[in-house]
Structure formats: C-alpha cells, structure tokens
Amino acid sequence: MVMKDMAMKKLARQMLGLTFAAACVLAARPALAEDYVIGAELALTGTYAWVGVPSREGLDVGIEEVNASDLLGGHKLKVLIEDTGSDKTQAISLINRFSARDKALMVLGPSSSSEGVAIAPVANELQIPLLTTTAVSEAINKSGPWVFKTPASPALVIGDVAKYAVNKMGVKSVAMVWGRNNDGQVGQKNAALETFKASNTKIVAEESVLTSDTDFLAVITKIIAASPDAVFLALVAEQSATFIIQARQQGIDPAVKFLGVPNFGSDQFILIGGKAVEGAIYVADYFAGTAGEENQRFVEAYRKKYNRTPDNGAALGYTAVKIAAAALRGAGANPTRDSVRDGFLKIKDFPVILGRGTFNFDNDRGARYEGVIMTVKNGKFVPAPE
C-alpha cells in the first residue's frame, strides 16, 4: 500500500512537471496577431453587378497581397464580403450589421452612387469609417467626416474627356445623355456640361433616362435630328453599349463621336457593344498597360486568378484594399475606428495603380488623381492619341 502511494505521488510530480513545462513553452511562444475585421458590401447581383463583381475580384487580389506581406506587422485582414443586390435597403442593413454585430473597424463599398448616398449618413451616425470602392458621387464623401472615396470625383476627371473632345477632336456641338436616377451619373453629366459650356461648345440636346431603360429609340431620334458632333453618355457599361448599338442601327451619322465616363472601361462595354463601340472615347481611372512594378504585379496576379485582364472596377477594388491597409497601418497599434479614420487622413501622395500613379484625399475626403483618356481600338482598350 505504501509503495502504491509513493508511486502515485511520483506520477503526480511528473504530471505537474509536464504541465509546468508545457505552460512555459506556451508562454514563450509569441501570441498570434489578431485579425483586423473589415466589412465589404458590393453589388454582386442586380443592376450594378457589372462593376460590383470585378471590384470584388480586385478586392480579393488586394487582400491576398496584403496578407502575404508584413505590411500590418503580423496582422491579417479579415474581410467580410456581402452582396447588396444593388439595393439601397440591403446596403443600409449591411453597414448596420458590420458595425454592431461584426465590430468591423471600417466598411468598404458600396458599388453604386445611389447605394453610397443611402449609407453615407448611416456611416457618419455610427461613426464607422466608410471607403467607397466604385461609387463616385460627391454627395457621398461630403456627407460627413467618416466617409472617404476611392474613385475620383466627377468634377475632377470627367472634364478631361470634354477637354479632349474639344481640343483634340474638334467637337463643336454635343448631345448629353445620363441616368437621372443615379446621383453619380447626374454629377458626371454636370461636370462635362460645365466644361463644354466653358469652351463654348454648343449643347444641342439634353436627354435623361432611367438606369433600368433598355429602349432608347425615342431619345436617339431626337439626337439624330439635332445633328451633334458628339454624344456624351453618363450611363452604366451595358446601357452605354446598348445605346450606341441602337444609335448605329437608327442610322446616326458615322462621323458622330461617342464620349463617356469611366464606366466605358468595363469589359461588358466591349463584350456587348462589339464593333459598334469602336472609336468610343472615355476617361478612365485605370489602364492595365500602365508601366510600374505594382501594376504589373496586380495584372499578373489578376490574370492568374481570373484568366482575364483587370478592368476599371477591378483596379478600384484592389486600390481600395491598399488604401484601407495604409489607413490601418497609420492607425498604430490596437486600432480603433477613430484611429483608423485618422489613418485615412494621414494618407498623402500614396502610390497607386490608378491614373498617373499618385493618390490623395481632398479636403472633403474625395479622391484626387489624374484620369487617363482611353479609346476602343480593334476590340481593345488603348490610350487615345495625344
């Protein structure tokens, strides 16, 4: 019996020693860095999926790149991606969920200006940083101090295509077409209109449509009768392509030039428009052929993952992640929503793949970078002649 008690005590001492040793090993091992939780709400279905899907793909490439690096000091991005369905009500529901349930440090998105205008006041009320991925309306970032934008404001870049049309193409008269129920498209039209008027270009027609419209024959008939040198379209990619096809079918003068906004830079524009969109001129946030190590790395990674060349939306999604990571880095250790917001405000002359390669926020937290004038040639997007 005594021998048995001694054996049990010896076993207990051995077990205690093993437990202590294991505890020492665990204490010596560095703790895993906590993930930084970010919400992302994008239009993966519905009206704005044409830009929401590629921006999500660009987002994924950016997340993989950041998480493979030591940019955040061992921390990783945990991005919760949800579909808004191109619906404002769903977009509002998601930002509330990201804030309250998921305790996200910030939110990326949404895809459209109509969704962005809807959720921007909510972001300010909740005091959670919001960085739009592809929504362009100035009303979004001007809604309050918690909202930032990745794409440049219409007033900054849209004027460039109008100036190009007047100075390089000799356009003296223009017809304007835009989506009246989309704040971003209204802003794009207004920016182009202001530039055209400043150059004494004659505005021969101003026609608005709904973003859901697919039959433009009545509008086209009016435009043909007005005999413009060019038609400026502030519409989504599919609508723009459909409009141009119908205009060609209706017999618009082949000499009429079609001018547009960054939406033209979607693969859907060429896929749907085909030969009808040859020669279209637009201002772009991005050109995949731009030189530079980061862009080449992005294009290579995107092509490897999706077997195609990234478009405007993909580049904006990727850039949004890189800007978000820079804000987190600038927020310091143990970031909070307040310090992340401060991190956004610290961003100056940030290298990006957009425009001419340098990004800043203006005083209203809108994006600033130079656009690139592009055209469609032989079924591909290429820089327009200088």
Model-derived features: positions:
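Beta-alpha junction/loop-to-helix N-cap segments that form part of ligand/metal-binding clefts
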Residues: 37, 50-57, 69-141, 150, ...
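Segments of small-molecule ligand-sensing domains
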Residues: 304-314, 325-383
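An alpha-beta-alpha
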Residues: 44, 147-211, 230, 324
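Extracellular/periplasmic periplasmic-binding protein-like sensory domains
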Residues: 244-318, 330-331, 375-384
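Extracytoplasmic "Venus flytrap"
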Residues: 36-58, 62, 82-89, 111-114, ...
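Extracellular/periplasmic bilobed ligand-binding domains
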Residues: 123, 188-283
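Hydrophobic alpha-helical segments within soluble ligand-binding/sensing domains
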Residues: 91, 150-173, 186-188, 214-217, ...
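Periplasmic-binding protein-like
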Residues: 98, 102-111, 131-133, 175-178, ...
